[in-house]
Amino acid sequence: MAILVSGGAGYIGSHTCVELLNAGYDIVLADNYYNSCPTALERVKEITGKDFRFYQADMTRRGDVEKIFQDCPDIDAVIQFAAYKAVGESCKKPIEYYSNNLNCTLNILDVMREFDCHNFVFSSSATVYGDPECVPITEDSPVGRTTNPYGTTKAFTERILNDCCEADSKLNVALLRYFNPIGAHESGLIGEDPNGIPNNLVPYIAKVAVGKLEKVHVFGNDYPTPDGTGVRDYIHVVDLAKGHVCAIRKLTQNPGLVVYNLGTGHGYSVLDVIHAFEKACGKELPYVIDPRRPGDIAECWADPGKAKAELGWQAQYGIEDMCAHSWNWQSKNPDGYSK
């Protein structure tokens, strides 16, 4: 059995490849390096001491996907990470987001059907819940009231996968709704390395801490939260990666379609994260309050009980470890993978 990991050189993908290899799986990795770079793959090999097949391929091109399956007839499951992923950018470029994110998955599903592959893990997001009526959020919370095109692409893809499972009783799908992944592998060899100025909070804080950016921008301090800043469920990327290994194991039981929240069940504000990072790096970090960003919500955290009960999965790291590992990565790699 081999697992195709599309978008496997990216932040979550690379950490998941480490966990899959360490768990004894054979992987086929595909990436077009749009949001990633080859160095990450060399670091994955360094961490695990294992090799894997790699294709520089674009999942929006069906021919690229078909070639991978033709070359690798042992592929028995797919973990689909390949997507554009910036909430703010999606509000400015909705057409690009809908085209890319939907077509990546549609092409993979079409080729899977052709090659008789029936196991699919989808990298979904808590953004499918939109602005929740209440927290913590369970898997039964309303879906589809999204507040940005990125989240809508995830909600649309979930609907597509639901329809595919209705039409094909052999298809097994795990929808993994991530909350807010941060942190890095404890080795400091792989981590989050965004192109240009980071869109997400923790890599931005890390760039400020390492002296690459001047100050942290806090978008809004007038939310109905304890300190006025947005509250999120931050999850260590290694915990998240291990959740994918558990999902692959679940699919071997032929469950049809299953849905899991992957979060810690704890909410932390933007200021909580800044202060935790200050503790990790041993310095005070300057920040300014800016207006809210379009598409942002006040608070969001998970009820991860279903994943614990059905997958045997539970997050192990707290916010202090997440920030410490992010700082370890950033301080060892101040310019990301480029140096």
Regions found by a protein language model. Name each.
Residues 1-184:
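N-terminal Rossmann-like NAD(P)+-binding domain of SDR-like oxidoreductases, especially those catalyzing
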Residues 6, 99-102, 150-151, 195, ...:
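Short, solvent-exposed loop/helix junctions and linker helices
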Residues 58, 68, 130, 142-150, ...:
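Alpha-helix initiation/capping motif
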Residues 90, 141-143, 180-235, 261:
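A conserved pocket-lining segment of Rossmann-fold NAD(P)-dependent short-chain dehydrogenase/reductase
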Residues 107, 204, 246:
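Alpha-helical scaffold segments in soluble metabolic enzymes
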Residues 207-339:
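C-terminal substrate-binding subdomain of Rossmann-fold SDR/epimerase-dehydratase oxidoreductases
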